[in-house]
Amino acid sequence: MSRKQLALFEPTLVVQALKEAVKKLNPQAQWRNPVMFIVWIGSLLTTCISIAMASGAMPGNALFSAAISGWLWVTVLFANFAEALAEGRSKAQANSLKGVKKTAFARKLREPKYGAAADKVPADQLRKGDIVLVEAGDIIPCDGEVIEGGASVDESAITGESAPVIRESGGDFASVTGGTRILSDWLVIECSVNPGETFLDRMIAMVEGAQRRKTPNEIALTILLIALTIVFLLATATLWPFSAWGGNAVSVTVLVALLVCLIPTTIGGLLSAIGVAGMSRMLGANVIATSGRAVEAAGDVDVLLLDKTGTITLGNRQASEFIPAQGVDEKTLADAAQLASLADETPEGRSIVILAKQRFNLRERDVQSLHATFVPFTAQSRMSGINIDNRMIRKGSVDAIRRHVEANGGHFPADVDQKVDQVARQGATPLVVVEGSRVLGVIALKDIVKGGIKERFAQLRKMGIKTVMITGDNRLTAAAIAAEAGVDDFLAEATPEAKLALIRQYQAEGRLVAMTGDGTNDAPALAQADIAVAMNSGTQAAKEAGNMVDLDSNPTKLIEVVHIGKQMLMTRGSLTTFSITNDVAKYFAIIPAAFAATYPQLNALNIMRLHSPDSAILSAVIFNALIIVFLIPLALKGVSYKPLTASAMLRRNLWIYGLGGLLVPFIGIKVIDLLLTVCGLV
């Protein structure tokens, strides 16, 4: 579930952003953006010239110079506004998280067990290793691990999901988050962080982005923009002696206007906003990224490691068929399978009971009246079953049943081996049923591939992204499901060590790898992956190892994370293309206006037939400022994203933003020139 989205121009955010835009006019803030710092200096210089002209200290048109100066200041303000609005949206999201933090007291236990004596202490004084007791109605005071008890927990304040979740000691569901509420029962929790280091604190810090560091691509683009600015600065500086030598020196105001229009102010003014908005969009998808670097890396990912269960398949395997061994009828197999599953509360176990009922009208027996001994499944035995009336019935994995049969002096039939292979090749999971040492047959558990997932993988393939399915199934089952789902490769019988080795192998080939995980055993692979999305329902170790946390705990979200990362990179690239190409139109507007008096031949470049030199220069400066405002929605929302190959995406962006950047300024400058002329302002 996603959080409520803020309107693009929320009135309160706009007002706050306008205030922040004015505050950012100080030199220290401007220095962080070299391109806009040049505009700021130009604004200051033309302001001083305007004052000097107005006072008579300098010759020239004070009104024209003041108009240029005013619009240069507006250009700086608009760039500040874009950044402030993006930051304001992030801070608004952070404020909603701050509302979760409440000043509360915690019951700190003197001993790590339920019922021990407790001291009431402020929650913000809890340290790592402290043990606390929380009961129904309490707010969990710290991040930690459940060491005793089990409870229903409302995590909606963090995740936005209203459905409660179960948290209990042991396993992968022992991690709890400070700020969530206990709905029932009780938990004894060991705090895993010190004050100020909780998941909620880190979320707020990341979302606010007060100390947002530039990403590598952002730094590289900034260097390019600085280089272009220096080139245009030197080129503009050389124009004054040329015009002076021609007998009609161009004014400093016009040269400043020319410089500002030629340097890439559009992308320079929107660059920070694009980065902040990328992290904000990620939060809109209920994913917390540790940094802009993580969001950017998501856009460069070219290998996705996807867990089969829950990501590629629905995750609830259902019994689909009873396949009896030679000499055994299907009803006998179904009866034994149902008996072995009566106490099995897993979805698979319940589906076996239901299938036997549907196929042979074998009604579900009353467990209490059977006077039977039920054998639960364990990781060691990998079997479960029932002992009843001198009958010992078991169901389990092929290897486990084979060992059981041989241990009881029996022989595993070759025809059952063939049936097991047949089930696995069809993409189902085989469970074998045995009574005593006699193998009765095979149950096929079918895991349903999610609808539309094959098409999504085809889109990823077009984008040059390789998909790899990770599963604990045997190779035959894994190969069948991989073929049905349309993934490029698979890792069967996966272990944490195998996943880690696979990630390192791809990285050694120069690829960027993304994966999801939720358990402590996933932590090494998460730490190694370039993009590691930890599930919020997972362990603390997994969340600390990842560089993103999915608050919805939805493994499929990894594909959306990649889309958001690519959208941010595309937005930056598209607006850079637009910014650089629209300099061409400004060149045709300002160069003839500024130098035609000295070099009449340049009148041939006045293809827009602008009214006068003053209106041409002022129109270009006004357009240069206004285009930043018009592009703010695109910077915040991101460009329209379509899954295409890199070459197709490049062609599309060049046509839309390259050609658009070339044509829009011609139209915009001409319209502004007409308006200025009609209104008699030039």
Curated annotation (Swiss-Prot):
**What Enzyme Commission number(s) appear in the record?**
7.2.2.6
Q: Its topology with respect to the membrane?
A: Multi-pass membrane protein
Record CDD domains: P-type_ATPase_K
- Which UniProt keywords are given for this protein, alphabetically ordered? ATP-binding, Cell inner membrane, Cell membrane, Ion transport, Magnesium, Membrane, Metal-binding, Nucleotide-binding, Phosphoprotein, Potassium, Potassium transport, Translocase, Transmembrane, Transmembrane helix, Transport
Keyword Plastid, does the record have it? Answer: no
- Provide the binding site for ATP: D344, E348, F377, T378, A379, Q380, S381, R382, M383, S384, K395
Fetch the Pfam families from UniProt: E1-E2_ATPase, Hydrolase
Residues annotated as binding Mg(2+) are D518, D522
Q: Which reaction does it catalyse?
A: K(+)(out) + ATP + H2O = K(+)(in) + ADP + phosphate + H(+)
| Main location as per UniProt | membrane
Q: Which domain of life is it from?
A: Bacteria
Q: List, alphabetically, the PROSITE patterns matched.
A: ATPASE_E1_E2 (PS00154)
Please name the catalytic residues of this protein.
D307
**Chain segments annotated as transmembrane:** 34-54, 62-82, 219-239, 254-274, 588-608, 616-636, 656-676
Q: What class of enzyme is it?
A: translocase
- Any Gene Ontology CC annotation: plasma membrane
Which PANTHER family does the annotation name?
Answer: POTASSIUM-TRANSPORTING ATPASE ATP-BINDING SUBUNIT
**Xref: NCBIfam families:** ATPase_P-type, kdpB
- What's this protein's function? Part of the high-affinity ATP-driven potassium transport (or Kdp) system, which catalyzes the hydrolysis of ATP coupled with the electrogenic transport of potassium into the cytoplasm. This subunit is responsible for energy coupling to the transport system and for the release of the potassium ions to the cytoplasm.
What do we know about how this protein assembles, alone or with others?
The system is composed of three essential subunits: KdpA, KdpB and KdpC.
Regarding protein family, the annotation reads:
Belongs to the cation transport ATPase (P-type) (TC 3.A.3) family. Type IA subfamily.
Q: What is this protein called?
A: Potassium-transporting ATPase ATP-binding subunit
Q: Which organism is it from?
A: Shigella boydii serotype 4 (strain Sb227)
Give the gene that encodes this protein.
kdpB
